[in-house]
Amino acid sequence: MTAESAPPPPPQPETLAAVKEERGEAAAAGAGVPAEAAGRGAGGRRRKRPLQRGKPPYSYIALIAMAIAHAPERRLTLGGIYKFITERFPFYRDNPKKWQNSIRHNLTLNDCFLKIPREAGRPGKGNYWALDPNAEDMFESGSFLRRRKRFKRSDLSTYPAYMHDAAAAAAAAAAAIFPGAVPAARPAYPGAVYAGYAPPLAAPPPVYYPAASPGPCRVFGLVPERPLSPDLGPAPSAAGGSCAFAAAAGAAGTGSFQPAVCTGARPVNPAAYAAAYAGPDGAYPQGASSALFAAAAGRLAGPASPPAGGGSGGVEATVDFYGRTSPGQFGAALGPCYNPGGQLGAGGGGAYHSRHATAYPGAVDRFVSAM
C-alpha cells in the first residue's frame, strides 16, 4: 500500500465550524434576514413574547379596584367597569376585547369583590360590584401597581349589608312549596320578596302519658275534628287497670262525676291508641268543672244521669258531645260486644300494649277485630 492510495486525514474542528458559518450566512443573505438574527434563532432559546406598547402596568384586579374606587356610590356594574377602563387607558380601547374576559374572571374568582343584586325599582340590568371593606388596604398607600397579598374572605356573616340571611331564605322557600309545614319557631322572612306568604302555623303540643297509669281502653269511633269543651278535665284511672269514662254533670257547677268501671275481659290483641290533647307542659288540661275527660277515647260518651231502676229496660242513656249515637245505648242487645260505657268489648282493665303505643302513637285505631 503506497502513500498515494492512503485516505486523506480528517478535517479539523475549526474547519467544520467555519464551513457551517459560511453556509448560514449565505442562506440568510438569500432570504433577506440579518445574519445576527439568523444565528440567534438557530442556536439560542425561544424569545419571550414582546411587551405590548402602551399597556398600563396594572393588574386586572387593580384596574377593577380603581374603577370601583372612583365611582360615586363605590359600586359599579360590569359595563361601568369596562367604560372606566377604556376611557382612562387607550390601550384597552384600541386592542381586541379579550381583556374583558379577564375582567369578568377576576370579578368572580376573587374574594375582594362583592356582588350586590340590583334593587327592584332601579332601572337597568346586571348586578353591582363593590370592593370588600376589609380589602381596601390590599394596595399600599393607594398605589395599584402591585397587590400586597391575596385577600381571602373567611367569615360571610361579617358582611350583613351584602349577604342575605340564608336561614330566612330557606324558610321562605319552604313556605312557598309547603305552606303548612313551616315550623312555628322560625319567623317569617321580613323581606319584600316573601312578604305575601302567610305566617307559620302553631306546632301541636307534646303528648305525655304517665307510665304508672293504665292505658286507655279500645273505643269505637274516630278522633273528633271539633275542639273539645273547655269544661272537661282529666279522668282519674281506677285501680287494677280499669277504665274511667266521662260523665256529664247533672247540673252546671255541681262538680260531680260518676265513673263507670270496665268489668269484662279485654280483647286478646288490643290496638289501643291515644288521642293527644295535652297542654303546653305535656299534662292534660284541667277544666273549670270536674267533668271527666276520656283521654284515649277520642270522643266522649258517658251516663248523663244514674240509670233509672228498670224504667229504661236495660238501656242506658248516654251523652255524645259530637252528635253521634253511642253503642252504649244498645247495651242490652249488644251485651257481649259493648259495655255500658259504649266501648267495644266487655273487657276490664289491662296493661297498655307498649308495642302498639310505640308503633302507632296518636293514631286512630284502624284494626278493629271482626265481631
From Swiss-Prot:
<dbReference type="GO" id="GO:0016477">
    <property type="term" value="P:cell migration"/>
</dbReference>
<dbReference type="InterPro" id="IPR036388">
    <property type="entry name" value="WH-like_DNA-bd_sf"/>
</dbReference>
<keyword id="KW-0597">Phosphoprotein</keyword>
<dbReference type="InterPro" id="IPR001766">
    <property type="entry name" value="Fork_head_dom"/>
</dbReference>
<keyword id="KW-0805">Transcription regulation</keyword>
<dbReference type="GO" id="GO:0060023">
    <property type="term" value="P:soft palate development"/>
</dbReference>
<dbReference type="GO" id="GO:1904888">
    <property type="term" value="P:cranial skeletal system development"/>
</dbReference>
<dbReference type="GO" id="GO:0030878">
    <property type="term" value="P:thyroid gland development"/>
</dbReference>
<feature type="DNA-binding region" description="Fork-head">
    <location>
        <begin position="55"/>
        <end position="149"/>
    </location>
</feature>
<keyword id="KW-0539">Nucleus</keyword>
<dbReference type="GO" id="GO:0005634">
    <property type="term" value="C:nucleus"/>
</dbReference>
<dbReference type="GO" id="GO:0060022">
    <property type="term" value="P:hard palate development"/>
</dbReference>
<dbReference type="InterPro" id="IPR050211">
    <property type="entry name" value="FOX_domain-containing"/>
</dbReference>
<comment type="function">
    <text>Transcription factor that binds consensus sites on a variety of gene promoters and activate their transcription. Involved in proper palate formation, most probably through the expression of MSX1 and TGFB3 genes which are direct targets of this transcription factor. Also implicated in thyroid gland morphogenesis. May indirectly play a role in cell growth and migration through the regulation of WNT5A expression.</text>
</comment>
<dbReference type="GO" id="GO:0031069">
    <property type="term" value="P:hair follicle morphogenesis"/>
</dbReference>
<dbReference type="GO" id="GO:0045893">
    <property type="term" value="P:positive regulation of DNA-templated transcription"/>
</dbReference>
<dbReference type="InterPro" id="IPR036390">
    <property type="entry name" value="WH_DNA-bd_sf"/>
</dbReference>
<feature type="compositionally biased region" description="Low complexity">
    <location>
        <begin position="26"/>
        <end position="39"/>
    </location>
</feature>
<keyword id="KW-0238">DNA-binding</keyword>
<dbReference type="GO" id="GO:0048562">
    <property type="term" value="P:embryonic organ morphogenesis"/>
</dbReference>
<dbReference type="GO" id="GO:0160093">
    <property type="term" value="P:chordate pharynx development"/>
</dbReference>
<dbReference type="GO" id="GO:1990837">
    <property type="term" value="F:sequence-specific double-stranded DNA binding"/>
</dbReference>
<dbReference type="GO" id="GO:0043565">
    <property type="term" value="F:sequence-specific DNA binding"/>
</dbReference>
<dbReference type="GO" id="GO:0006357">
    <property type="term" value="P:regulation of transcription by RNA polymerase II"/>
</dbReference>
<dbReference type="GO" id="GO:0000981">
    <property type="term" value="F:DNA-binding transcription factor activity, RNA polymerase II-specific"/>
</dbReference>
<dbReference type="GO" id="GO:0060021">
    <property type="term" value="P:roof of mouth development"/>
</dbReference>
<dbReference type="Pfam" id="PF00250">
    <property type="entry name" value="Forkhead"/>
</dbReference>
<keyword id="KW-0804">Transcription</keyword>
<protein>
    <recommendedName>
        <fullName>Forkhead box protein E1</fullName>
    </recommendedName>
</protein>
<feature type="region of interest" description="Disordered">
    <location>
        <begin position="21"/>
        <end position="53"/>
    </location>
</feature>
<dbReference type="GO" id="GO:0048538">
    <property type="term" value="P:thymus development"/>
</dbReference>
<feature type="compositionally biased region" description="Basic residues">
    <location>
        <begin position="43"/>
        <end position="52"/>
    </location>
</feature>
<dbReference type="InterPro" id="IPR030456">
    <property type="entry name" value="TF_fork_head_CS_2"/>
</dbReference>
<dbReference type="GO" id="GO:0006590">
    <property type="term" value="P:thyroid hormone generation"/>
</dbReference>
<dbReference type="InterPro" id="IPR018122">
    <property type="entry name" value="TF_fork_head_CS_1"/>
</dbReference>
